[in-house]
Amino acid sequence: MVQKAIVILAMQPIFGPLRTKLGMVTRAFFAQRDLNNVKLLEEFYETLESGVHRSPAKDKSISSDEDGNTLYMGTSIRECVHKWRFRTLMLLKLILLQKRIMVYGYPVEHLCTLQYSLVSLIPALLPHLQDAAAPELNTLSRDRVKAESLRMSDRDSLLAYMGLPLPLFSHDAFFQPYCPLQQIDNLRCKTWLIGTTNQIFKHQKTSQPDVIVDLYKMQLSFLDPTLHNLVSLTPADRKWMDDVINVVQSTWNSADPAQPVQMQYKGSDDYLRARFEEYVFGLLSTAKYCELH
């Protein structure tokens, strides 16, 4: 049996908006039972193209917040916090420290969703992954200009002043939510975040991970014991994270885990993303203060 697939190659990780559309088109296309009839695919392509030309990345009249809202579709911070609880903050710390992180398990959709949800916790990072596909790419750092002023009413100005986006997946770094064996050589770089369902990645010796995130066992396995101590939560971290977890638990909707009860703002992904943004801002401010004093 020959398997066929329809694949979208996109410049931005807009998987949430594309997933539903692609599913419907794929089912309709194969239901025709005529692979030579590609009119449906041509119309789908034209629809996507027109959407891209009106996307936030192309249209400067659309705010970065709207841009983010489009990219964040398909991620679920609520489910991440609900499942991983205090370990959510440990995973965030591991990414910020640019460690080698391997996420292992099935299904692939959950594998990828967890990684994109974690990356989305870091302000402005998800829309700036242009260097993540190969360790030798470094456009984000090369094109960076130091902010000389701050306009508090302008979110883009605030992000730039805080040094964002952080070049976490730029030079000598690699991010591949579902990594094929053909890219295993990229794991020789300094830092990476990958997802895999293949045990070969877990047992290869040349580029071992610092930590393995096991979706089956819901646990973090540290190959370096000192790293566990490094990312362990401080009393202040635990208190802060406890508040976040309580908000998620008190608004949990088992019928629709992605949305809080009564569709309120508190407990939503936007609310949680704002809380984690405050955490990252506080972390960066503290690091800068320590550097200057």
Pin down the residues of each PLM region:
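Acidic, Ser/Thr/Pro/Gly-enriched alpha-helical scaffold modules and adjacent low-complexity linkers
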Residues: 1-293
